Curated annotation (Swiss-Prot):
Keywords: Cytoplasm, Elongation factor, GTP-binding, Nucleotide-binding, Protein biosynthesis. It is found in: Cytoplasm. Catalyzes the GTP-dependent ribosomal translocation step during translation elongation. During this step, the ribosome changes from the pre-translocational (PRE) to the post-translocational (POST) state as the newly formed A-site-bound peptidyl-tRNA and P-site-bound deacylated tRNA move to the P and E sites, respectively. Catalyzes the coordinated movement of the two tRNA molecules, the mRNA and conformational changes in the ribosome. Coiled coil: none annotated. This is Elongation factor G. The lineage of its organism: Bacteria, Bacillati, Mycoplasmatota, Mycoplasmoidales, Mycoplasmoidaceae. GO terms for biological process: ribosome disassembly. One of its GO terms (molecular function) is GTPase activity. It comes from Ureaplasma urealyticum serovar 10 (strain ATCC 33699 / Western). Belongs to the TRAFAC class translation factor GTPase superfamily. Classic translation factor GTPase family. EF-G/EF-2 subfamily.
Length: 688
């Protein structure tokens, strides 16, 4: 079986928006025989972009999974979004992939969102190869793209191909391993002629090959010895070194082409097979057993079954689809599995291999593979399903908290019930989407990662669930925290004949910067019985959801229970829960609470002519400029700006730059809001 696993490649395609990821994926599907005709994103016909909104907007929102074959290898390919509002899709894909292809725009090289997805891939130790796309575009520069990798990503980027021609004259590439020229006919089947290197490229190719060998030989001792003794390295020697370097995540080979013009994708597929790891080349996945002991799984089909659910989607024909990556053992359809995260037993009705949103039924799946499961009702993103006799919880995924919210109201009574169902289904699919009811106003609030994120979700409610809603203006999700240390008492006593209520606690509250809520039990001598400690913690967690300044969630607080008392008859869990919330209210009077506002990382690209105007506008929005650099004939500005100042920025940037400026924005951190903002928020709160 390990022989078979050696032939698997689980890889994703990642990039900045508009670098050509989906077009590259479409060409891969065409060349591997999965598609008989090529879909283009600008026509709204791309196979991988199957949601209605994706076809309209020409961007990828969800990570579509598909499988294909290439030169005897089985490929599981995941196309991920490049838009920053949908990074959860990138995050959960990278968690289960063994390798990735980073697609760069040949003119722009590394762009802001490239840096974001690159960081995410580094976090999960995902080996990568790089495809410099759009080499036919005006201003395309392969060598500049490599420089941006070195300067902006700080990595060892090594060309294993170089382009022949550029812009409209781009005709093919020189393979530096074989030292041959590949000249493409530009037709859909990507036929090419292998020729000798053109005379005017020989010197450049020799220099670049020598550089490549210098970079890669260090990854294999035998090859290094050969190289140092002046022996000629074979193609296999070089490939072996590149593969080792890629798998170690210390080397990033760079290829070039233009997917849209059918040049270079077949060679990219060869590189996927040659250099990206198989499931047995990657480190084992870690987890904990039911006793909390660490455990490892080695992608071995003979070990007990364990898999990670990395995505939930609703299919109009079969209902709930759960995408899983199998790390150990084998799974057959019609069998039962144990969800160790939720402590529930579930039945696998059917197993399907997904080709975008089409389904091919399979009977079983083994370690190293990816598929979708029909029949799991309680399993959500990040859950581990496994063999009941050998429970395990695999490393879980941590997702960012939503930073923007808005209210939604059903237009009619009939829409009310449908809306609740739609929201619960959408929340199941997307861990960065939250929905709750505002206790004071009774409004239904939805929260997410950005305006586009919420816009798409509201659109899906209308289309997929036929729910008509009125949408409120976007609101910032502020937070609150304490800045001083204080001891606070919470006492809840109710005694009026019959059994009463008695709960009494002393809790120390202190700031816990960037560490979230932390609860510590320092009770000695049973002053508060053990069985009530959990209720004290629950009472605090509940109290934290509504802060003292403006009712926003209180974060980054450490609470230590150190004293209290109890009553033999009247004490109860509920009484201690209430006592804890009273202690929180007391602490809020003396711990000097402050309002925190979300600060966003903003990357703006503007033509030189509008640079001053754009900089002035950022400063006006309380932005702090962190850096700027020249990119071609444009300026790239990095800044930190409060989210509350960024509403309507897209429109202003368009008018300030005659429609030529671009920006991306993502959450960075929470920071204390100025007094004027706090007063404004409190005043708005008082009006409600």
């Amino acid at each position: 079986m390990s022989k078979e696993l050696k032939l698997f490649r689980n890889f994703g395609i990642m990039a900045h928006i508009d670098a050509g990821k989906t077009t590259t994926s479409e060409r891969i599907l065409y060349h591997t025989g999965k598609n008989h005709k090529i879909g283009e994103t600008h026509d709204g016909a791309a196979t991988m972009d199957w949601m209605a909104q994706e076809k309209e907007r020409g961007i990828t929102i969800t990570s579509a999974a598909t499988y294909a074959k290439w030169k005897g290898h089985s490929l599981n390919l995941i196309d991920t979004p490049g838009h920053v509002d949908f990074t959860v899709e990138v995050e959960r894909s990278l968690r289960v992939l063994d390798g990735a292809v980073a697609v760069l725009d040949g003119q722009n090289g590394v762009e802001p969102q490239t840096e974001t997805v690159w960081r995410q891939a580094t976090k999960y130790n995902v080996p990568r190869i790089v495809f410099v796309n759009k080499m036919d575009k005006t201003g395309a520069d392969f060598y500049y793209s490599i420089e941006t990798m070195k300067n902006r990503l700080g990595v060892k980027a090594t060309a294993i191909q170089i382009p022949i021609g550029a812009e409209a004259d781009f005709v093919g590439s020189i393979d530096l391993i074989e030292m041959k020229a590949y000249i493409y006919d530009g037709q859909a089947d990507e036929e090419y002629k292998i020729e000798d290197i053109p005379a005017d490229y020989v010197t450049k190719a020799q220099v670049m090959r020598s550089q490549m060998i210098d970079d890669v030989a260090i990854f294999d001792d035998e090859v290094m010895e050969k190289y140092l003794s002046g022996e000629e390295l074979s193609h296999e020697d070089i490939k072996k070194c590149i593969r080792k370097g890629v798998i170690s995540t210390e080397l990033y080979p760079v290829l070039c082409g233009t997917a849209f013009k059918n040049k270079g994708v077949k060679k990219l597929l060869d590189a996927v097979v040659d250099f990206l790891p198989s499931p047995i080349d990657v480190p084992p996945i870690k987890g904990v057993d039911d006793h909390g002991n660490p455990i490892e799984y080695h992608n071995d089909p003979s070990e007990p079954f364990a898999a990670l659910a990395f995505k939930v989607a609703t299919d109009p024909f079969v209902g709930r689809l759960t995408y899983i990556r199998v790390y150990s053992g084998k799974l057959d359809k019609g069998t039962y599995v144990y969800n160790a995260t939720k402590d529930k037993k579930e039945r696998i009705s059917r197993l399907v291999k997904m080709h975008s949103n089409n389904r091919d039924e399979i009977d079983s799946i083994s370690a190293g593979d990816i598929c979708a499961v029909i029949g799991l009702k309680d399993t959500t993103t990040g859950d581990t399903i496994c063999d009941e006799k050998k429970p395990v919880i695999l490393e879980q995924m941590v997702f960012a908290e939503p930073v923007i919210s808005l209210s939604v109201e059903p237009k009619t009574k009939a829409d009310q019930e449908k809306m609740s169902l739609a929201l619960s289904k959408l929340a199941e699919e997307d861990p960065t989407f939250r929905t709750y009811t505002n206790e004071e106003t009774g409004q239904t609030i939805i929260a997410g990662m950005g305006e586009l994120h919420l816009d798409v979700l509201v659109d899906r409610m209308r289309r997929e669930f036929n729910v008509q809603v009125n949408v409120g203006a976007p609101q910032v999700s502020y937070r609150e925290t304490f800045t001083e240390i204080a001891d606070a008492e919470g006492k809840y006593i109710k005694q009026s004949g019959g059994r009463g209520q008695y709960g009494h606690v002393w809790i120390k509250f202190e700031p816990n910067h960037d560490k979230g809520f932390e609860f510590v039990d320092n009770i000695v001598g049973g002053k508060v019985p053990k069985e009530y400690i959990k209720e004290v913690e629950n009472g605090l967690i509940e109290a934290l959801t509504s802060g003292p300044i403006a009712g926003y969630q209180t974060i980054d607080v450490k609470a230590t229970i150190f004293d209290g008392s109890y009553h033999d008859v009247d004490s109860s869990g509920m009484a201690y829960k209430i006592a804890a919330s009273l202690a929180f209210k007391e602490a809020a009077k003396v711990c000097k609470p402050v309002l925190l506002e979300p600060i966003m990382s903003v990357d703006v690209t503007t033509p030189d002519d509008y640079f001053g105007t754009v900089m002035g506008d950022i400063s006006k929005r309380r932005g702090v400029i962190e850096g700027q650099e020249q990119r071609g004939n444009a300026q790239a500005i990095k800044a930190k700006v409060p989210l509350s100042e960024m509403f309507g920025y897209a429109t202003d940037l368009r008018s300030n730059t005659q429609g030529r400026g671009q920006y991306i924005m993502q959450f960075s951190h929470y920071a204390q809001a100025p007094k004027s903002v706090t007063e404004e928020v409190m005043a708005a709160r008082a009006k409600k």
